[in-house]
Amino acid sequence: FQLPPCQLINQTVSVEKEGCASCHPVETTICSGHCITKDPVIKIPFSKVYQHVCTYRDFYYKTFELPDCPPGVDPTVTYPVALSCHCGRCAMDTSDCTFESLQPDFCMNDIPFYY
């Protein structure tokens, strides 16, 4: 079994904005795949060990206008489009570095709220 290497893939992601009724799927490119990591057997206190993740090398932001926002709510949202990927430290400002992240097509608007 061979894991796919860190590479660009096409992905449908959901974009949404607080105040707008629903989320909308958009096509983009993201970074996905396996990076070789090492975990030292002997742990040295206070030493920094970084796990490499598949993350953006180059990207730009694309703008999408949500069609169902009420008056007074700015309907524009931006989302990243990956141009190239590499294995490196996780950049918290551009990547989801959590252990179990939400799926790219997850929508907060789909969660029922109970009052």
UniProtKB/Swiss-Prot annotation:
Glycans are attached at residue 10. Its main location: secreted. It comes from the Eukaryota. CDD domains: GHB_like. Keywords: Disulfide bond, Glycoprotein, Hormone, Secreted. InterPro entries: Cystine-knot_cytokine, Glyco_hormone_CN, Gonadotropin_bsu, Gonadotropin_bsu_CS. One of its GO terms (cellular component) is extracellular space. It is found in: Secreted. GO terms for molecular function: hormone activity. Disulfide bonds join 6-54, 20-69, 23-107, 31-85, 35-87, 90-97. Belongs to the glycoprotein hormones subunit beta family. PANTHER family: GLYCOPROTEIN HORMONE BETA CHAIN, LUTROPIN SUBUNIT BETA. This is Gonadotropin subunit beta-2. The gene is cgbb.
